[in-house]
Amino acid sequence: MAQILKFPPQASKLGFKRVRKRSRPTENDDQLNLFPAPVAQILNLESGLSSFEQALMLDERGDLKAEELYIKAIEEQDCVADACCNLGIIKSHQGDALKAFDCFTTSLKHNPRHSEAHYNLGNLYFEANDFRLAQIHFEMASEVDPAFANAYFNLALVQAINNDFSAALVALSKYQQLVPKEEGRIAEELLQTIRKSLAVLKNSRA
């Protein structure tokens, strides 16, 4: 009989992750890059900032003009993957899941190893109850960026939902290793819940 895993109240998934720095274009790790391609950048003469940098600054202040500047950055080919990713978060907060999905997938077209885009796409699939695809993207996010703590937490949630309790324990332990002790406490009750579920599962097989 399938078991229903009851999560503690604070075990809801962690939210979307905005890109806060410029990411370099995808490179082949096996190939020495002697001539790195320049990143397209059109500076605003008044502020000295590119469209992406202006958008990010406004976005972090909660200014609605950020959306317009992310679109401008994309048109100018300025940090396209990052701009698409952050625009996707804005669209998600506006309740436009389809547009958010389009933004995150476009980000991955420009940079298939964009950890934040994988993570945010995983969150969209999670909210749509497509836990299989959510798990794939959380796994990709943690693989691309092994220090991406939130990816491990959400991965553990999905793995627990998918009854892969052993893997969930590993992911949650990794999360606790990466965050300060205070933040790691939100995982304690979830760890206990997963351990109990794993024990019940083992006993049922005995």
Q: What function would you assign to each model-found segment?
A:
Residues 1-49:
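Long, contiguous interaction/recruitment modules in multidomain scaffold/adaptor proteins
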Residues 52-59, 82-93, 116-126, 150-157, ...:
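Conserved alpha-helical positions within TPR/SEL1-like repeat arrays
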